[in-house]
Amino acid sequence: GVLYAPDYLGSDDYETRVWPTINVSDGDRFYFNIRDGLGWNLVRHGNWKLSPFIGYIPGRDNDEDLERLDKIDGGAIAGLRVAYNHDAWLYSAAVQSTFTGDVDGYQVVLKARWRNQFSDQWFASLGPNLTYSSDDWTDDRFGISDTESARSGFASYSPDGYARYGLTGSLTYSLSAQWSVTATAGVSQLTGDAEDSPIVSDIGEATQA
């Protein structure tokens, strides 16, 4: 698929890039997709599922507005997700932490998603999400060290944790049992110490589409 999104979290510059929309599952036990990573439904009880998972978070290049700041390498994450399915709604809560790359700390991710099938081929989903990032995670993403400050002219900045909330919707047309076309749109809002970072307040935008 094709993705049009900010070139880094907090940016006001958008870029278009190719984005794979793979969605693979092995019955109700294993799953893999770009949004949720690779997971194993270790516990399945009624409408509840508990799954350990691994995934990936992208990094940030040090070019254009950020050319005098340090580059941030993306990395792998590991976490645990609990999900509850009730009628057309799917609720989930996950805790995840990196084990490679330049970002330390952890995140707590809460999601709710409404799903509806309009016909044999058309599907839609819509739902809110809330992500809390720890002090270390936020500092690695939005902080500015004394060295970076001297190079860039931005004020030194050492943030604490922050929350990001948003809304995401999708529309899917099924071509066959294996292939489909999906359009996804969303908006999110950075708050607190992330919103106040010079990377966002001076050269970026707290509202992300």
Residue ranges and their predicted role:
Residues 39-41, 101-204:
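Outer-membrane beta-barrel transmembrane domain signature
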Residues 1-33:
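Short glycine/proline- and aromatic-enriched beta-strand/turn motifs that initiate or cap beta-hairpins
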Residues 28-32, 48, 88-92, 121-124, ...:
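Repeated loop/turn-to-beta-strand initiation elements of outer-membrane beta-barrel proteins
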Residues 1-6, 30-38, 62-67, 90-99:
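Transmembrane beta-strand segments that form the barrel wall of outer-membrane beta-barrel proteins
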Residues 1-5, 37, 53-57, 94-98, ...:
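Outer-membrane beta-barrel pore domains and translocons
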Residues 22, 34, 50-54, 82, ...:
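Membrane-embedded beta-strand positions of outer-membrane beta-barrel proteins
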Residues 14-20, 46, 72-78, 104-108, ...:
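Residues that define the transmembrane beta-barrel architecture of outer-membrane proteins
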Residues 2, 24-26, 42, 82-86, ...:
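Residue-level signature of outer-membrane beta-barrel architecture
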